[in-house]
Amino acid sequence: MSLSVEKKAAIVAEFGRDAKDTGSSEVQIALLTAQINHLQAHFAEHKKDHHGRRGLLRMVSRRRKLLDYLKRTDLAKYSETIARLGLRR
């Protein structure tokens, strides 16, 4: 259920400041969004996977906290990030 190395590298290259920038809020939010989207497809097929759903909710909560932090510290990057990821807010 995790992302491939190539997919992670592509996300880091798209949202990071350089190729090794994995710690910035924008990159972390983009990686979590990709994982969440992948898991949503999984739960469409496996409706009774409650243990996995708990992990999904944990990821959504972590993404929400990172988005709140980004909004508090840099509103322009927050707006750009949610627009690029297609998140509603």
Curated annotation (Swiss-Prot):
BP terms from Gene Ontology: translation
Keyword Ribonucleoprotein among UniProt keywords: yes
Gene Ontology CC: cytosolic small ribosomal subunit
InterPro entries found in the cross-reference section: Ribosomal_uS15 (IPR000589), Ribosomal_uS15_bac-type (IPR005290), uS15_NS1_RNA-bd_sf (IPR009068)
Coiled-coil residues: none
Assigned keywords, A-Z: Ribonucleoprotein, Ribosomal protein, RNA-binding, rRNA-binding
Origin superkingdom: Bacteria
Gene3D superfamilies recorded: 6.10.250.3130, S15/NS1, RNA-binding
Single GO MF annotation: rRNA binding
SUPFAM superfamilies in UniProt: S15/NS1 RNA-binding domain
Alphabetical list of SMART domains matching this protein: Ribosomal_S15
Function: One of the primary rRNA binding proteins, it binds directly to 16S rRNA where it helps nucleate assembly of the platform of the 30S subunit by binding and bridging several RNA helices of the 16S rRNA. Forms an intersubunit bridge (bridge B4) with the 23S rRNA of the 50S subunit in the ribosome.
Family listed: Belongs to the universal ribosomal protein uS15 family.
PANTHER family (UniProt xref): RIBOSOMAL PROTEIN S15, BACTERIAL AND ORGANELLAR (PTHR23321), SMALL RIBOSOMAL SUBUNIT PROTEIN US15M (PTHR23321:SF26)
Database matches in NCBIfam families: S15_bact (TIGR00952)
Subunit structure, as described in the record: Part of the 30S ribosomal subunit. Forms a bridge to the 50S subunit in the 70S ribosome, contacting the 23S rRNA.
Alphabetized HAMAP family for the sequence: Ribosomal_uS15_B (MF_01343_B)
Name used for this protein in its record: Small ribosomal subunit protein uS15
Biological source species: Mannheimia succiniciproducens (strain KCTC 0769BP / MBEL55E)
Taxonomic classification: Bacteria, Pseudomonadati, Pseudomonadota, Gammaproteobacteria, Pasteurellales
Name of the coding gene: rpsO
